[in-house]
A protein has these predicted regions:
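Active-site PLP attachment segment
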Residues: 152-196, 223
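Short, small-residue-biased leader/transition segments that mark boundaries at the very start
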Residues: 1-9
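PLP-dependent aminotransferase class I/II
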Residues: 15-23, 27-31, 94, 106-110, ...
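A short alpha/beta connector and helix-capping loop motif
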Residues: 90-99, 147-156, 348-356
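PLP-dependent aminotransferase-like
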Residues: 48-137, 144
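Phosphate-binding glycine-rich loop
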Residues: 10-57, 71-75, 81-83, 148
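Structural detector of well-ordered beta-strand residues that form the stable sheet scaffold
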Residues: 34, 59, 80, 133-134, ...
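Conserved active-site segment immediately N-terminal to the catalytic lysine
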Residues: 135-168, 184, 208-213
Length: 359
């Protein structure tokens, strides 16, 4: 008998995780990456590494998925909502400054739809007040700000690999950073705060030994998922190029439409175009939305301002109002945008929306 192994294949934790982390880190230009179970856990880990806790405030946008604010609550902190720029729909640095108090510890900047935020202005404010900057790049893998990819700009950046994102691992997420301390904290956090690293442990009783140093979570991603992620990364630039082609056709089709407002693109940025969000004017948004769904078109709305959700209304946010975010929310519809969308399908979307909006 030659011996018995406990497991023949590294299905849960294996070499593809490190390979995927290195691939994404190299792509965006970051030193370190931590692959994790999903985009929400990535935000949670980033807030944990930033030291967010009770009494701390974190400024973020209301025009986002709830996870961008919930991650602050998970750590015991308080989300504070700054209004958005009416053109880009991203967080407005001027309102960030207005919302800063002596309890502010960090800013979470969300690159809505893949359009990068005004990071120079945000970094200037963060430097002035000694704040940590976390970028929620769930929509923005491949997006570029002034010649640099999102993921190389701030203290930490999170990504999501949900099925509708630029690439997918089924479910999955990642945090990238140049800060070794943040990296080590997040690597522990995703696996119960446990390590087998001799350089960190206070003692070692044998090959079986491990120690827990933080109250972490089981946020591990599997080797199988990361193998898919490695394959997807080889296709990312092709996916992004196709998204840009679709966006260009939408922009051209709606260029002369008074009742359809197309996304604003900053001249010194490149959006990853996760979403194509239009505003419909002089017509009933709900009627347009429901009619398009009835015609088999998968439209959506991104997003309901976070503080308008019942949970937030019942927990101290009932008097919060961000005028720009609420005005934008009342008019927006997200049109289908994915690499497999055909020109014929897109023409059907365009013609249907124009007809419903009186164009």
């Amino acid at each position: 008998m030659t011996g018995v192994q406990t497991c023949a294949l590294p299905i849960s934790t294996g070499p593809k995780i490190a390979e995927f982390e290195q691939t994404v880190a190299d792509y965006v230009g970051a030193k370190y990456a931590v692959a994790i179970s999903n985009g929400t856990s990535a935000l949670h880990a980033a807030c944990f590494a930033a030291g967010i806790g009770p009494g701390d405030e974190v400024i973020t946008t209301p025009l986002t998925f709830a996870a961008s604010a919930n991650c602050v609550l998970y750590c015991g902190g308080t989300p504070v909502f700054a209004d958005v720029d009416p053109k880009t729909y991203n967080i407005d640095p001027k309102d960030i400054r207005r919302k800063i108090t002596d309890r502010t510890k960090a800013i979470i900047a969300v690159h809505l739809a893949g359009q990068p935020c005004d990071m120079d202005a945000i970094h200037s404010i963060a430097h002035e007040y000694g704040l940590i900057v976390i970028e929620d790049g769930a929509h923005a893998l491949g997006s570029v700000y002034k010649g640099k990819k999102v993921g190389s700009l701030s203290d930490m950046t999170t990504f999501s690999f949900h099925p509708v994102k630029p690439i997918t691992t089924g479910e999955g997420g990642m945090i990238v950073t140049d800060n070794e301390e943040f990296y080590k904290k997040m690597a522990l956090f995703r696996s119960h705060g446990i390590t087998r690293d001799d350089s960190m442990m206070t003692r070692n009783d044998g090959p079986w030994f491990y120690q827990q140093f933080d109250l972490g979570y089981n946020y591990r991603i599997t080797d199988i998922q990361c193998a898919l992620g490695c394959s997807q990364m080889k296709k990312l630039d092709r996916f992004l190029a196709r998204r840009k082609e679709i966006v260009a056709r939408y922009n051209e089709a709606f260029a002369d439409c008074d009742n359809i407002i197309t996304p604003y693109q900053l001249s010194d940025t490149e959006s990853g175009w996760h979403l194509y969000i239009v505003q419909v004017k002089n017509c009933d948004r709900r009627q347009v939305f429901e009619a398009m769904r009835e015609k088999g078109i998968g439209v959506n709305v991104h997003y309901i301002p976070v503080y308008m959700h019942p949970y937030y209304q019942e927990h101290g946010y009932e008097n919060v109002h961000c005028a720009n975010a609420e005005e934008i929310y009342s008019h927006i519809i997200s049109l289908p945008l994915y690499p497999g969308l055909t020109s014929e399908q897109q023409d059907y979307v365009i013609d249907t929306l124009k007809s419903l909006c009186g164009e």
